[in-house]
Amino acid sequence: MIIVTGGAGMIGSNIVKALNEIGINDILVVDNLKNGRKFKNLVDLDITDYMDRDDFLTQIMAGDNFGPIEAVFHEGACSATTEWDGKYMMLNNYEYSKELLHYCLEREIPFLYASSAATYGETTVFKEEREYEGALNVYGYSKQQFDNYVRRLWQDAEEHGETLSQITGFRYFNVYGPREQHKGSMASVAFHLNNQILAGENPKLFAGSEQFKRDFIYVGDVCKVNLWFMQNGVSGIFNCGTGNAESFEEVAKAVIKHHGKGEIETIPFPEHLKGAYQEFTQADLTKLRAAGCDVEFKNVAEGVAEYMAIVNG
């Protein structure tokens, strides 16, 4: 069996779909369906079982046996970069992750987890090294702290001549694609621009967006990276982006091209995001490629075109 936490979320449900596509359906999805709309992400997927996050954590902390587990994809987290309740964020993204990690280490279960490019903050260098990290929000800090916890475990193991079972963290950059409709304001720019055009409006970008460049990665490519590491058993913390930064304007142009209408409008940059907003991200893929991962990534034009074809079917 494979366990996917956050399995009803955007990345989690796409990982389940990718597993289904290679013939794997013995999957336990763990999530919190308080936001009931997320169920739609599971409707067309083939899974063995579903478990509420709190019930799952209770069983994990009790050391319960789930039977043979081939791997755990830990995608479950509070991913709202605008959430400032640090106690809530650290409990969800740090403490719970440690519990699950140790459960997996004790049983030598491969543990593949979601980190984030939010760990980098304002740097212009995006290498998986401590000197370039400095989160701008509490979400990024929770991910940064868990990465550092994992690093300490590796260091301790090395000092004692031990080898840990697989732990692989993925620093997701700006992920977009199908199954994000439940995310509200946290959904991708492509999602919001598409909805604006469908509503008969022009697509709207923040003033200065031509200067803001991000590494936008299509969710299908994120899944390919996850599956490659599951199949190859490589440990480490790796960037999961395309290696190229493109502007928000490029995203808007790709959405406009799909619809054949619309002109970009600018709106004022929100006060609450000033000082807590990454204006530039671009994954350094040196470490990913050195590990042997040869997944090729779609650019914005290609990825958004595929996304629009799916959601506007």
From Swiss-Prot:
Domain of life the protein comes from: Bacteria
Pathway involvement of the protein, from the record: Nucleotide-sugar biosynthesis; ADP-L-glycero-beta-D-manno-heptose biosynthesis; ADP-L-glycero-beta-D-manno-heptose from D-glycero-beta-D-manno-heptose 7-phosphate: step 4/4; Bacterial outer membrane biogenesis; LPS core biosynthesis
Cofactor needs: NADP(+)
Name used for this protein in its record: ADP-L-glycero-D-manno-heptose-6-epimerase
Cross-referenced InterPro entries: Epimerase_deHydtase (IPR001509), Heptose_epim (IPR011912), NAD(P)-bd_dom_sf (IPR036291)
Pfam families, per the entry: Epimerase
UniProt signal peptide: none
Binding-site positions, substrate: N174, S185, H192, F206, A207, G208, S209, R214, Y277
Reactions this protein catalyses: ADP-D-glycero-beta-D-manno-heptose = ADP-L-glycero-beta-D-manno-heptose
Keyword terms of this UniProt record: Carbohydrate metabolism, Isomerase, NADP
Cofactor detail note: Binds 1 NADP(+) per subunit.
Quaternary assembly: Homopentamer.
